[in-house]
Amino acid sequence: MSPNLNGPGGSDDSDRPDEPDDSDRPDESNSTGNPDTPDDRPNKTPDRPSDHPSSLLDQLRAILETLAEIEEDGHRQGHGRIDRGNAQIDYDYEVSFGLGPRSRRGKPSDEPRVEAPRTEGTDSQPEGEKSIHIETRETDDGERVVIADLPGVADDELDVTLDADESALELRTDEGIVGRVPLDQPDVEITDVRLRNQVLEIRLTRTNESNGSESK
């Protein structure tokens, strides 16, 4: 019988489980020697898009640059976007200048004159006369009513006459002729003239004198 060299209750080394070799353990350290720091850290700050302004100041700068570009054209429109954190603001803009390049090359008198077209029921004033708004209408009784806006005109400054040569009704003030209404019926007479609250109302009726003279 061989003696127990491990003492009482002992066990042989061959019965112990094999401990893992250090070479089999994963290397938790990175190249810098910090075991708790991963090699590649994610970039927590996303890149801001370069194609949109990053602040209101950048947007104002872009608008000023656009104004400089359209100085000769006189008009520009477009759209853009402002990024403010997680919010995005889309906008449209339109810029116009009141005077175009031709205003710098010539006087206002050199510009071509554009006359407004005549509309039915509204009589335009001849060139050189003060522009006022005049309307005419026919009543069921055959009367013709002329209504004119005369701001700043007093009753004693107004004179209404019939121009038989041109078959027109003339409105005159101390400044001259302010309106002329063509008449398609020359045989008319003024029956009533009223100026109330700077609104002139003239009533015209047709006369039968010419027809009566022809029948005799």
UniProtKB/Swiss-Prot annotation:
Region (Disordered) location:
1-141
InterPro entries hit by this protein: GvpH (IPR008633)
Q: Which UniProt keywords apply?
A: Gas vesicle
Listed Acidic residues bias regions: 15-25
What triggers or suppresses the expression of this protein? Transcribed from early-log phase, decreases as cells enter stationary phase, probably as a long gvpF-gvpM RNA. Highly expressed in 25% salt, poorly expressed in 15% salt, no gas vesicles are formed at 15% salt.
Q: Where in the cell is it found?
A: Gas vesicle
Q: Return the Basic and acidic residues bias intervals.
A: 38-51, 73-84, 107-141
Pfam families from the entry? Answer: GvpH (PF05455)
A single Gene Ontology CC annotation of this entry is:
gas vesicle
Protein task: Proteins GvpF to GvpM might be involved in nucleating gas vesicle formation. A minor component of the gas vesicle. Gas vesicles are hollow, gas filled proteinaceous nanostructures found in some microorganisms. They allow positioning of halobacteria at the optimal depth for growth in the poorly aerated, shallow brine pools of their habitat. Expression of a 9.5 kb mc-vac DNA fragment containing 2 divergently transcribed regions (gvpD-gvpE-gvpF-gvpG-gvpH-gvpI-gvpJ-gvpK-gvpL-gvpM and gvpA-gvpC-gvpN-gvpO) allows H.volcanii to produce gas vesicles.
The family this protein is said to belong to: Belongs to the gas vesicle GvpH family.
Q: What else is known?
A: Encoded in a 14-gene locus called mc-vac.
Q: How does it assemble?
A: GvpF to GvpM interact with each other in vitro, and may form multi-subunit complex(es). Interacts with GvpC. Might interact with GvpA.
**Name of this protein:** Gas vesicle protein H
In its UniProt entry, the species of origin is given as: Haloferax mediterranei (strain ATCC 33500 / DSM 1411 / JCM 8866 / NBRC 14739 / NCIMB 2177 / R-4) (Halobacterium mediterranei)
Q: What is the lineage of its organism?
A: Archaea, Methanobacteriati, Methanobacteriota, Stenosarchaea group, Halobacteria
